[in-house]
A protein has these predicted regions:
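Long, contiguous internal "core" modules enriched in hydrophobic/ aromatic residues
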Residues: 6-14, 19-314
């Protein structure tokens, strides 16, 4: 019986004495282990690509390859998280600028006419009020005992308006709240202008925001990303306004399609971004990772297509 604590070492750099135990476990490949199912599932995320038969590794697969796969996934998550951060900041800036200009109001977030009326979610049956949701977030942060520094400065310096200006309020929103705020805008013109900045139709943009929130949470919780089949699939981009990819890459439930979304959005934020070279460097650092599981397609000859030759990535 192997102590369950060895599983935790896959969440950090492996230390010498646990290394032997993990090798022994992998060689035995027994599920008679005193560990909960979530722990086994987490490990299995890195095992499955190397198994054609359940509980049996393919010939030639060693512990180093499994560990490399984990490290590759960790570095991929860090890269993705960094990209999402840059895009998220740009979305905040664009929404603040566009809406303040369209309504000639630095406090547009306090105008209920900017948002759709309360409605019932067709899936959950829950009542949704975008305006009131935003106001609750603002009130919670403005009345907190230890608010953000910029909120404290506003509260100590100004008495009216009660709420800070929009560019401060937007900094209080999580990615998910930002996504819901965009969907809750009443005027198509407002949504269109924000989406146009990123070269997208509003419907596609809102769908991508939803997926980006989902992936951000995956990264934040250190979950396996590289070969994940997405529960929240992004819309397929059928009418790109900028360079995109051939239809073979439209495997939108896999990670490479999401990486392509990040690249497309980053071009609007910084045309000279280095995502192509960073991703290529990561692939070269871990040459044994089966990247076909990320959603990179093969040609008729069965050979993986060269993603770097696609207009989006070149």
């Amino acid at each position: 019986m192997i102590h369950p604590s060895i599983f935790s070492y896959l969440g950090c750099e492996l230390i010498a004495y646990s290394y032997f135990l993990i090798i022994k476990y992998l060689q035995n490949r027994s599920y008679e282990v005193n560990a909960n199912s979530s722990t086994r599932d987490r490990l299995s995320a890195y095992f499955l690509p190397y198994q054609h038969v359940k509980n049996k590794f393919n010939d030639g697969v060693g512990i180093d390859q499994i560990i490399d796969n984990y490290r590759f996934d960790r570095e991929l998550r860090l890269l993705v998280f960094d990209c999402i951060e840059r895009i998220e900041i740009a979305i905040r800036a664009q929404m603040t600028h566009i809406l303040a200009h369209n309504y000639n109001n630095s406090h547009w977030q306090d105008n209920s006419d900017v948002f759709v009326s309360p409605y019932r979610n067709r899936v959950t049956g829950q009542m949704i009020d975008p305006y009131e949701e935003l106001q609750k977030i603002i009130r919670k942060n403005c009345t907190a005992n230890k608010p953000e520094v910029f909120i404290k400065h506003y509260r100590d310096t100004y008495h009216t308006p009660q709420n800070p200006p929009s560019w401060m309020c937007m900094e209080l929103l999580t990615m998910g709240e930002l996504s819901r705020l965009y969907v809750g805008l009443k005027q198509n013109k407002d949504r269109q202008e924000v989406a146009n900045f990123f070269g997208l139709h509003p419907t596609v943009f809102s769908g991508w925001l939803h997926t980006m929130t989902y992936v951000r949470n995956i990264c934040a919780h250190h979950a396996c990303l590289w070969n994940r089949e997405f529960a929240i699939k992004p819309d397929i981009l059928l009418k790109p306004k900028r360079n995109w990819m051939q239809p073979a890459y439209n495997i939108n439930q896999r990670t490479f399609y999401f990486l392509s979304i990040l690249k497309y959005l980053l071009i609007a934020v910084n045309p000279n971004n280095h995502l192509t070279s960073k991703l290529d460097t990561l692939f070269l650092k871990y040459p044994n990772i089966p990247i076909q599981f990320m959603g990179i397609p093969s040609g008729k000859d069965g050979v993986l297509l060269n993603w770097k030759e696609e207009p989006l990535w070149s």
